[in-house]
């Protein structure tokens, strides 16, 4: 789980955007898997 958050932060330079897309990113990664 920690790796996921780090990856998202690294991919998204905008911390605020990442926070708002936190639930969307998690679902996207789950679907991709």
Swiss-Prot record:
<comment type="function">
    <text>The rhoL-rho operon is regulated via attenuation by Rho-dependent terminators within the sequence coding for the RhoL leader peptide. It has not been determined if translation of rhoL is required for this Rho-dependent termination to function.</text>
</comment>
<feature type="compositionally biased region" description="Polar residues">
    <location>
        <begin position="1"/>
        <end position="25"/>
    </location>
</feature>
<dbReference type="GO" id="GO:0031555">
    <property type="term" value="P:transcriptional attenuation"/>
</dbReference>
<protein>
    <recommendedName>
        <fullName>rho operon leader peptide</fullName>
    </recommendedName>
</protein>
<keyword id="KW-0428">Leader peptide</keyword>
<feature type="region of interest" description="Disordered">
    <location>
        <begin position="1"/>
        <end position="33"/>
    </location>
</feature>
